[in-house]
């Protein structure tokens, strides 16, 4: 199995433990989210690139995205509750990642709303991860 798939699956498994059956989970950034699928949690990677830090190793880094989607009418404080009570606590300790990545460093936090269909509001936390193939 591809390392990126294993990373996403490890994070999703931990989030499922923390959130239970109260959300729909996506392996990757969904192209479309139906209102019936909300709340939803998505995990995806972007900007994967070779770092070349060690001459004799295959060092890589990528951005790990974890996002929660809720109904567009909900206030940002509802997104904050999701992040603070479910998402962030789950991300503090993911034992399954220990053999897959070397480091996981918080990078940023973002809010976004669906401008086209007004279906969802999203909060996203990103981490810089480093790993060796």
Regions found by a protein language model. Give the residues of each.
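A short glycine-rich, His/Asp/Glu-containing loop-to-beta-strand
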Residues: 38-43
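Charged, amphipathic alpha-helical segments and their flanking helix caps
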Residues: 1-33, 45-133
């Amino acid at each position: 199995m591809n390392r990126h798939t294993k990373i996403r699956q490890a994070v999703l498994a931990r989030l499922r433990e923390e959130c239970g059956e109260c959300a729909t989970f996506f392996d990757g950034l969904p192209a479309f989210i139906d209102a019936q699928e909300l709340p939803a949690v998505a995990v995806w990677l972007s900007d994967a690139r070779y770092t070349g830090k060690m001459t004799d190793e295959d060092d890589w880094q990528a951005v790990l995205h974890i996002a929660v989607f809720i109904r567009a009418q909900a206030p940002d404080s509802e997104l904050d509750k999701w992040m603070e009570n479910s998402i962030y606590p789950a991300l503090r300790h993911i034992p399954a990642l220990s053999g897959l990545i070397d480091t996981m460093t918080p990078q940023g936090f973002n809010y976004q709303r669906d401008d086209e269909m007004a279906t969802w509001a999203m909060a996203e936390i990103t981490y810089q991860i480093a790993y060796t193939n």
